[in-house]
Every structure is written in structure tokens, then in C-alpha cells.
């Protein structure tokens, strides 16, 4: 089974926290998708990554990494997120039937807290994503409303399912 990591889980530290035995297969992209940052629904306490495929994403590519993993992870639910299926075009020339998480109801455009955000540019650099793409993601981040408590600490060293524990 394949997971498409496009946001915080690009950082080796984060993917290992949530899927310790996941193995990277290839870098790739999801056509007509883009990485956005939004609050969850009506909440305004923080932003999260969102894997958008609305009209604004037409013609864009969300870059990421295909990870092979134990199927048990497909059953893991997190507050405010749903699993979605996506075809990923791998840099190895193959296509992959993947799944990933996205917000169920994206609210206003809002930045995530710093502890969360830092995994994104770190991961993109670890995977040698193009500087142009990294700058594009930075611009999306900069255009979003500030996180009310951007400096809040990571609430848990051990990931939980509830929004309060992440």
C-alpha cells in the first residue's frame, strides 16, 4: 500500500513518528493538486496542511514522496482529516495508486504553528525539491493568516488522534 507524503511527513522525523516502518519508493507529483494551509472548519486556533484539488489547483502539481507502508495505517483516523485517493506520477516513470490525508472542511487560509511548519521546508530540502517549488509553498504560507499562537510548543512527542494532541 502506498501513502503520498506532501507536507509535514516529507520530513524523515515526522514520517517515522507516524509510520515507523514506511519505506520511500520515489519522489513524484499529484496533478491538479496543491498544498494549501487552512484552519479546520470553523476553528481558528491554528492552520494545517491541506491537499487541495479544487478549481484553483487546475494545472498545478503537488510534489511529494510515495511511501510503501503496512496497510494498518490506512485505518488511522485523525480529527478534522479524511483519507483520499490520488494517482501519483513517480519520478521513476511509474504511476502509483496512493492515499493521503486532507482536511475534511478547510476553513480560512491560516498558517500552522511553527513546530508544524518547520517540518515542511526541512522535508522539501531533504528530498531536494526544486527551489522554485519551495518558494511557491513559502508564498502560500506567507499569504495565509497568521497562526494565533505560532510559537506554541508541540503538544506531544507521541502523536495522538485528536487535534489537541497534535
Question: Language model features by range: what are they?
Answer:
Residues 1-166:
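Glycine-aromatic micro-motifs
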Amino acid at each position: 500500500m502506498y501513502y503520498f507524503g506532501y507536507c509535514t511527513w516529507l520530513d524523515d522525523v515526522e514520517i517515522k513518528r507516524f509510520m515507523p516502518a514506511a519505506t520511500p519508493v520515489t519522489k513524484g507529483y499529484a496533478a491538479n493538486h496543491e498544498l494549501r494551509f487552512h484552519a479546520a472548519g470553523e476553528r481558528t486556533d491554528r492552520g494545517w496542511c491541506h491537499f487541495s484539488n479544487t478549481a484553483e489547483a487546475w494545472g498545478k502539481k503537488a510534489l511529494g514522496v510515495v511511501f510503501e507502508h503496512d496497510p494498518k495505517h490506512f485505518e488511522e483516523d485523525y480529527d478534522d482529516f479524511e483519507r483520499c485517493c490520488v494517482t501519483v506520477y513517480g519520478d521513476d516513470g511509474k504511476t502509483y495508486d496512493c492515499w493521503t490525508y486532507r482536511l475534511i472542511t478547510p476553513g480560512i487560509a491560516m498558517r500552522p504553528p511553527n513546530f508544524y511548519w518547520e517540518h515542511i521546508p526541512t522535508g522539501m530540502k531533504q528530498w531536494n525539491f526544486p527551489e522554485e517549488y519551495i518558494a511557491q509553498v513559502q508564498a502560500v504560507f506567507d499569504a495565509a493568516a497568521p497562526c494565533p499562537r505560532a510559537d506554541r510548543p508541540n503538544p506531544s512527542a507521541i502523536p495522538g488522534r485528536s487535534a489537541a494532541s497534535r
